[in-house]
Amino acid sequence: MGQIIIDGGARLQGTVTVGGAKNAALKEMVAAILVPGRHQLNNVPDIADVALMGELLSHIGCRLQREGTTLWIVSPERLNPEAPLELVRKMRASIVVLGPLLARCGEARVALPGGDDLGARPIDMHLEGLQQMGASFRLSHGVLEGEAVNGLAGAEIELSFPSVGATENLMLAGVAAKGETIIVNAAREPEIVDLARHLNAMGASVTGEGTPMLHVIGTPNLSPAEHTVIPDRLEAGTYAIAGAITGGDVTVTGCSPTLLRMELSKLEDAGCQVRKGEDWLRIEGPERPQPIDFVTLPYPGFHTDLHPQMVALLTVASGTSIVTENLYDSRFRYVGELARMGADISIESQHAVIRGKRELSGCPVLAPDIRAGAALVLAGLRAEGTTVVGDVYHIDRGYNGLVDKLRAMGAAIARSD
């Protein structure tokens, strides 16, 4: 499964460039299902999840070609409306093929999704919304079988929670449905906004992106388009925290600091000096961070996918911090690994109480998911001695060249496969 070996104590200095946003690229790849022809995406990250989505699209009938960060997807006239378990179980984002397949083919067979096991991730909102649009479902041996005998029709759908995945699925279905779909309490994430831009470039009519109410008007004459994926704010945030935890001086380029307002504000509260421009940010970390409290919330709140990295930072703060996780009930599974390194963290329901210590100690740990794996690497950068992070295939799902980028900024880090 591979290991990352870190000799801690180096202060990171230098510049790192981030790639395209994983959480935008995956859904924009799926948009190719909607219409036959050759689609082009630029700034696509070279990560395992993108490769997995490519395998899924190939199974459905698409042909893919990649050159650098540019990806071409050729969608055929006839699709195989099936997403098999061996692909879907590895990545929860694959559930978003459900809506487009129903819209394009009138049927879909999708195994239930996997990916990072972060507790209860019901897809009820996806199904309820698609049912309001005319779909019907049944579950057979772990495979969700959907039909839209008369096609999908627009509807007003109110989400009980601003789910990113449900919003995306209903957007993708809505652009190929008949009539207007209104999504109330829609997710507002930047990746939703970017997906709307991509769909509009294909000839769709999506308005209200970035607000709680999305209007999607079905368009019969969609066509392939070229689109450039937005920068990955989670990769940018991870490197910013890497600079902070090492007391370093790190400049992140190719990013959008405006998409990290809450997270950068919390880094400032922790004692970091933050400077930023239109497409760059610079973090100068303190010798020891100040304790802070934060709560994870849907955008524009603090992103749950930067929670573990920030907790790693707070394990060496000069006091006690409290972190509240409101989105995923199993997000704290990594805490036991940080405790092996000497962190003092106690969990009470969805709250973590972090009592900062002056230093951590390197030891063998296992990455339980993408962001927790990144957090353990950051902890290893700060720890005394050697840290060995196992199960790094999780990290590969969301980061391209993490080891090389950290080494270029002075980290004593290597990978063993």
Say what each PLM segment does.
Residues 1-417:
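Short, structured segments at the rim of ligand-binding sites
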